[in-house]
Amino acid sequence: GRGFSAPAGVDEAGRGPLAGPVVAAAVILPPGYFHPGIRDSKKLSHRQRERLYPVITADAVAFGIALATPGEVDALNILRASLLAMRRAVEALLLPADFLFIDGNRRIPCDVPQETVVGGDGRCVSIAAASILAKVSRDRMMVEYDRIYPGYGLSGHKGYPTREHLEAIRRLGPSPIHRRTFRGVVV
């Protein structure tokens, strides 16, 4: 982290789903931190991510997890809602970050100096750690939502547009956590 004492990696999960929030995480790791298992959450199994979650939260100097609601996704658009969730995750850090490494190519709207890293979840350990916290947190929320809104199979597909999910929306109509502005969500 080039001389910064508290750089945070920031990433989000849940841009593509038709239902549920966008969840973001910001993680500050100790200087020189390395863990062979921590890499892009999309390359890890559900079980590997669940196993790494408590390792990351224990080892991190600080972490923040936050979300943008399905209503905010509809009101703002998915990109702006993702950036909002990431800003909230940075604001949730108990130790303020002095620099941000953001996965992707869009800066987040806040005053902390930052650098965007395309493919960052595969190139920067703090972004990879953030991707795991965001994905695990979101997956756990979707399992809870499946209990509240049964019939859509949310705990299986996590809100992504599977055939089963699209058929359930056609059959049941959208739930309160469905993103009304997304194609496939028939109101």
PLM region spans:
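RNase H-like, Mg2+-dependent phosphodiesterase core
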Residues: 1-187
